[in-house]
Amino acid sequence: MEPFQTIRQGIIDRYSVLVDNPTEFAEAIHKPLKQSFRINTLKGDKENILEQLRNYDPEITEVPWNNNAYVSQLNNLGSSLEHFVGQIYIQELTSMIPPVVVKDVIDNNAILDCCAAPGSKTTQIAGMMQNQGHIIANDSRHARLKSLRGNLDRLGVTNATVTLRDFKSFPNTEADLYLVDAPCSSEGTIRKKNAVARMWKEKDYKRFTKLQKGLLNKACEMAPSGSTIVYSTCTFSPEENEKVISEIIDNQSVKVENIGINGLKTSPGITEWNGETYDKEVENCMRIWPHHNDTDAFFIARLEKC
């Protein structure tokens, strides 16, 4: 068996017990993803851009739960003129979820994107805000700032400030929304071969969990009462998802808000895994399984600071 097939089978074996339909889950893991993208209305009218894109692919389809997200049968839209000038942004559908679940709190507000590079969510939110309000786009790795700044510039974002700092030592900063799209084991991207194979070799849940808790604790500590904190990962691992949230509930004055998106099939967070029991509030978290919406896997929690 090829190494990547072994990786897939390991994921199927570990997580099939959590899903509603193990057969469909396994089939989805082996299917490649279609290319998805969103239209950047900072650089043009949506319908005009769509008309241009349909010259390449007449079968482009809108995603039912996000009226600015689309799926194409082509896999080379990243080479198109529309991508080059910033009218579209190639992005996995699940990566677009965090801004969608906080669209009620972003207008003209202050936002801190704690782990921003390469800028997928920063640019998405800037587009939703139409460059109003202010976004601090922080990342801890200098090597990733080039892609972050490049994407902000290409997409015409003017309301973002880029910072380079380990977020755990970031100065206390009041904001209305904190995004913690945390580094993770990336298991949920198994349908994209190259992204996962590299991460799977260092499958160290404890290491990631420690990092994730540090980032989320910092965001919760600096967040003022009434503000929103969103935590997300692209992994199946409960150790990096529900366990992190459960421990944050124990240590911070936060509550987990119940979230849902019309047109998107989701599952609640799990409360038991490998002999551990998590706080019942984690059921308000959102899990996305690959076989439910033909996407990557994803986890998201929306917290309110009390």
Residue ranges and their predicted role:
Residues 1-306:
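S-adenosylmethionine
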